[in-house]
Amino acid sequence: RLVTEAKKRGIRIILDAVLNHTGADSKYFNKFGNYPGVGAYQSEKSPYHNWYYFEEFPDKYRCWWGVTVSPTLNKSDPSLRRMMLHKGGVIRKWTDMGIAGWRLDVVDELEEDYVRSLRRVIKQRDKDKLIIGEVWEDASNKISYGKRRHYLLGGELDGVMNYVFK
């Protein structure tokens, strides 16, 4: 209903997708036990355990920039990819609801094949959906984890945040 009402008023909605990490208090990680289900932090048998990188279960896990309340997602895990990209998944569901596009948080932390998969799913639904990436450095010449990125060469993003061009 929000998307429909916004369109009537000439407003388009772009969602901010954080696909690199979750909060430690998300239902998937559930570090503080605030949700009824068993999160990845609580049990190695959790359906979400492989969504994260545990080095020493449960207290030593990869985090975005070492921030322990932001555990890093294992984007190559098949069940996480299904939840994000496949039928009934987050990206398809919201794209099909009529949003105008996506802003991808810390896109330089996402592997290129993952970003291409996101683009494919989004553009198959509607080629005019906008995909913007958050890149803190010069996105036209970015090297991330030792690899040159190709954000703006047609296979990944439509645009980037312009932090370096103040």
Protein language model features and the residues they cover:
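The substrate-binding groove and active-site-proximal loops of carbohydrate-active enzymes
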Residues: R1, Y28, V67-M83, I99-E109
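Aromatic- and glycine-enriched glycan-recognition loops and surfaces
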Residues: R1-L15, R82-H86
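Active-site-proximal helices and loops of the catalytic beta/alpha 8
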Residues: V3, H21, N30-G37, G89-R92, ...
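Histidine-centered active-site/metal-ligand motif
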Residues: K7, H21, S26
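Short beta-strand segments at enzyme active-site cores
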Residues: I13-A17, R103-L104
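Serine-centered coil/turn micro-motif
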Residues: S26, S46, D77-P78, G89
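Core domains of carbohydrate- and sulfate-ester-processing enzymes
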Residues: K27-L73, K166
